[in-house]
Structures are given as C-alpha cells and as structure tokens.
Amino acid sequence: NQKCSGNPRRYNGKSCASTTNYHDSHKGACGCGPASGDAQFGWNAGSFVAAASQMYFDSGNKGWCGQHCGQCIKLTTTGGYVPGQGGPVREGLSKTFMITNLCPNIYPNQDWCNQGSQYGGHNKYGYELHLDLENGRSQVTGMGWNNPETTWEVVNCDSEHNHDHRTPSNSMYGQCQCAHQ
C-alpha cells in the first residue's frame, strides 16, 4: 500500500512524508496563541497547520520555536498509506500546511515522530519526515485524508494562502510568539 520506496523513501523523484492528524486546542511549540495561557488562535485550529517530527522541527532538538516554525510545506498524496494506519486517498491531491507545532517523540507518537537525532534517520514506517496535521475543525478528515502517504516540498506561504485561504499567510504567522524571537 506504500508507494514511496528506497532509503530515504521517495516517489517519482520527490521526498516522502508520513502523516497523521490530531487536535489538542493548544497553541503549540511555535507559540500560535495569545501570550498568556496555552490556547491557540482560531486560525491555528481551523487552518492547514502541522506538527513536524523533531529532526525537521529543529535539528538542535529545541522543543519551542524550532528553526522551521512558520515554514510552509506542500503535501501531495501518492495514493499510498501505511497498512493498518490509514486508508487510500486519490493520488495527486495537494494541500499546503504551515509548521506551527512539534510532534514530540513521546507516547503515543514514538512510531511516527521518532526519526532519531541525526539527519537521515527515519520513523518506524521508513519516513524521514512525519507531519501530524491539525484537524480541529475537521479540515483534514473533511477532505477524506486518512493518514495518507505524501510527497513534500517547501513552498511560499503567501502564494499558497492566495490560492487557498486555509493555508496561513506569513502575516498570520507573524501573530505567533516564535515569529518574534
């Protein structure tokens, strides 16, 4: 069922990532919520945002304000998925997600978010990058995405926001605490 292969996993020449979805109502490790408290901004709950696995979030293992906070990643479905962990999604569907959180290597995330502490590591399923997609307003499951395998590439947030307003803009990320550090 997985279409990505090799080490690192690739599909049609592009790097692959595993995905899951979550909702926790917290502002996340990029500080995308009011400075006082732990609540998230409304746009952070309902937009295309993601928690990245540790090595991508910050190669120095920071748990707050990682080096890729605010970066946008275009995910394109391969039509594959990890058997027993998701379901098929048509190949070629692309959506862009902004990194606003960390998927920590702690329970229950170890199988997905543990890529080790050095570049080139991979999770239990063979992926160098894992993205846990915010589903606070069913924005992920509402598209029919059930933990699809994807390819990924870094893209410009504002260009993607202009195409689909569910992708946060750079000015929206500017409200986050980590945008000012």
From Swiss-Prot:
InterPro entries: RlpA-like_sf (IPR036908). Disulfide bonds join 4-16, 30-69, 32-176, 65-178, 72-157, 103-113. Transmembrane segments: none annotated. Its EC number is 3.2.1.4. Optimum pH is 4.6. It is an enzyme of class 3 (hydrolase). One of its GO terms (molecular function) is cellulase activity. Pfam families: EXPB1_D1. Keywords: Carbohydrate metabolism, Cellulose degradation, Disulfide bond, Glycosidase, Hydrolase, Polysaccharide degradation. Optimum temperature is 30-50 degrees Celsius. Digestive gland. One of its GO terms (biological process) is cellulose catabolic process. It comes from the Eukaryota. It catalyses: Endohydrolysis of (1->4)-beta-D-glucosidic linkages in cellulose, lichenin and cereal beta-D-glucans. Belongs to the glycosyl hydrolase 45 (cellulase K) family. Active towards the soluble carboxymethylcellulose (CMC). Possesses expansin activity too. This is Endoglucanase.
